[in-house]
Amino acid sequence: MDLSESLHDFILVFLGSGLILGSLGVVFFTNTIFSAFSLGLVLVCVSLFYILSNSHFVAASQLLIYVGAINVLIIFAVMFMNGSEYDQNFRVWTVGDGITLMVCTSIFISQINTILDTSWHGIIWTTRPNQILEQDLISTSQQIGIHLSTDFFLPFELISIILLVALIGAIFVARQ
């Protein structure tokens, strides 16, 4: 996207905030439905990051595969589960939880140190869409990606909608 630098930075901070809040919601919500919806927010924010960096095909794939299929399946699975199983076996803290907390905290601190120690001034964040020419592409998978995101985008989207409707219909029929 050809945006001014200040608008690009504002959108980047907004998406980062949505990503952080959504991931905190995934971890801290006690209701699994709310946690699954927070996961959907995280996946949509990641897809919008791809759009911001001019990777439209990857963004469309992210939306279709992860948000449109995986997250919907997670929500359906949570809806079909019996919630009383979890209430009976609830424990506050175990030794494994403490070890996991220490490992995750150390990984988080090391990632923060890596981010702060990295020089970000020489990195080119985006490419212009007109810089990619079809004859310059190395592999056929890149050519397929270009054609799916330009010439065949509408059929690709229609097939994904048909598959989603078929999945919802199969779950509805199986439930009855």
UniProtKB/Swiss-Prot annotation:
GO MF assignments: NADH dehydrogenase (ubiquinone) activity; quinone binding
Record's catalysed reaction(s): a plastoquinone + NADH + (n+1) H(+)(in) = a plastoquinol + NAD(+) + n H(+)(out); a plastoquinone + NADPH + (n+1) H(+)(in) = a plastoquinol + NADP(+) + n H(+)(out)
Superkingdom of the organism of origin: Eukaryota
InterPro entries: NAD(P)H-Q_Oxidoreduct_6 (IPR050290), NADH_UbQ/plastoQ_OxRdtase_su6 (IPR001457), Nuo/plastoQ_OxRdtase_6_NuoJ (IPR042106)
UniProt keywords, alphabetically: Chloroplast, Membrane, NAD, NADP, Plastid, Plastoquinone, Quinone, Thylakoid, Translocase, Transmembrane, Transmembrane helix, Transport
TM stretches of this protein: 10-30, 32-52, 63-83, 92-112, 152-172
GO cellular component term of the entry, any: chloroplast thylakoid membrane
Compartments in which it is found: Plastid, Chloroplast thylakoid membrane
Membrane topology (UniProt): Multi-pass membrane protein
Entry EC no(s): 7.1.1.-
Signal peptide: none
Keyword Plastid attributed: yes
Main location: plastid
Role played: NDH shuttles electrons from NAD(P)H:plastoquinone, via FMN and iron-sulfur (Fe-S) centers, to quinones in the photosynthetic chain and possibly in a chloroplast respiratory chain. The immediate electron acceptor for the enzyme in this species is believed to be plastoquinone. Couples the redox reaction to proton translocation, and thus conserves the redox energy in a proton gradient.
Assembly mode: NDH is composed of at least 16 different subunits, 5 of which are encoded in the nucleus.
Family listed: Belongs to the complex I subunit 6 family.
PANTHER family in the cross-refs: NAD(P)H-QUINONE OXIDOREDUCTASE SUBUNIT 6, CHLOROPLASTIC (PTHR48479:SF1)
Protein name per UniProt: NAD(P)H-quinone oxidoreductase subunit 6, chloroplastic
UniProt source species: Phaseolus vulgaris
Organism lineage string: Eukaryota, Viridiplantae, Streptophyta, Embryophyta, Tracheophyta
Gene that this polypeptide is encoded by: ndhG
